[in-house]
């Protein structure tokens, strides 16, 4: 069960978050069997839905944030969707987590280093620590940091101070893990911890 929530911050601002529950549904009532987990630790995956009667559990989200959707520079249209993601459950100790794998990722060209624009993907193996950063052509920047306990994404822009952002997620894999980064223009989708931690961030 996934829920799109509006959470009130201490500052009075709203935070838009998706979380999910693992449990049993008998056709009328859902019974959660464990605590809720965050679906996406970035800011640009909201109101995601799955498809009834599909052969697999496929998730598709709105790749924007109500916090700044009207401030992001745009022409002709203002709205994008995430890649479709195949969902499976994986148990880590006594908790079940959703593993998210982008559908059709093979069609994206593979690069060794991030590009400032265009469509590309990277596949990365990491262990205790990892760091990666790049900029778009208009100066928007993103930095990815991984340490023993956290996966952290920082977004910056030299002119747009409102674009500053820090997202943090807990590490779930002990030891070596894998990560896919998929870029489509200014939309970055990060699938870390073997797909157990996702972050969707729009650069602007």
Language model regions located:
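Internal metal/ion-chelating core segments
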Residues: 1-34
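Beta-rich accessory regions
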Residues: 24-204
């Amino acid at each position: 069960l996934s829920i799109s929530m509006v959470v009130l911050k201490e500052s009075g601002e709203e935070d838009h978050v998706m979380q999910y529950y693992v449990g049993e549904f008998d056709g009328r009532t859902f019974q959660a069997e464990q605590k809720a987990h965050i679906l996406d630790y970035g800011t640009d995956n909201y109101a995601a839905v799955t498809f009834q009667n599909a052969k697999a559990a496929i998730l598709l989200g709105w790749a924007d944030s109500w916090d700044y959707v009207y401030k992001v520079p745009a022409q002709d249209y203002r709205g994008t969707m995430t890649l479709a993601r195949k969902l499976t459950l994986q148990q880590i100790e006594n908790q079940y987590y959703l593993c998210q794998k982008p559908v059709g990722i093979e069609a994206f060209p593979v690069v060794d280093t991030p590009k400032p624009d265009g469509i590309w993907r990277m596949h990365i193996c990491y262990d205790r620590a990892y760091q990666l950063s790049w900029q778009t052509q208009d100066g928007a920047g993103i930095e990815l940091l991984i340490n023993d306990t956290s996966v952290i994404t920082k977004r910056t822009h030299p002119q747009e101070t409102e674009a500053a952002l820090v997202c943090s997620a807990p590490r779930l894999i002990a030891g070596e893990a894998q990560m896919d980064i998929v870029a489509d223009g200014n939309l970055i989708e990060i699938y870390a911890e073997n797909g157990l931690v996702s972050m969707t961030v729009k650069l602007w």
